[in-house]
Amino acid sequence: MLILDTNHTQEISRGSPAGVRLLNRLRECGDSVATTIVSAEEHLRGWMAEIRKRTKPEEQVDPYRRLLTTMEFYSAWLVLPWDFEAAALFSLHRTGGVRIGSMDLKIACIALAHEAVVLTRNSVDFSQVPGLRHENWLD
């Protein structure tokens, strides 16, 4: 199984040339592909923050449209949950000294729980998680 990190899902959702190439490669690879509730949270929170920044209702139209588009995007994917197994792995790695961002560590622990490969641009942080397999399919 392949798990898309937030930076990979964002490229696909934007329809960027790199995202289009990634989507084509995913279709051809034959592996099951998922993302995580953590990536969905990060992506959705970004648009919610944009909405909160705008004080005029007409300035909120585009961020709300993008929020809806993002929700629709994630509804088309298998989204893996944050569960007790991932939470236990998170605690184990934190007490074991892994010091990366909480959201990245949550994504890593979901991947470990599913014995999956994380597709990410962030190899610096993800390489600090023992046993985690990760690849960058964008660059």
Regions found by a protein language model. Name each.
Residues 37-38, 83, 122, 138:
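Residues at the C-termini of beta-strands that transition into short coil/loop
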Residues 1, 108, 112-139:
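Acidic, PIN/NYN-like endoribonuclease modules and their adjacent C-terminal/linker elements
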Residues 45-51, 73-119:
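Active-site neighborhoods of divalent-metal-dependent phosphate/nucleic-acid chemistry enzymes
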Residues 13-16, 47, 94, 130, ...:
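Short, flexible helix/strand-to-coil boundary loops that buttress conserved ligand/catalytic motifs
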Residues 4-5, 100-101, 122:
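Histidine- and aromatic-rich ligand-binding microenvironments
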Residues 1-38, 49-65:
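Short, well-structured N-terminal submotif of metal-dependent ribonuclease cores
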Residues 8, 39, 86, 107, ...:
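Alpha-helix capping/helix-boundary segments
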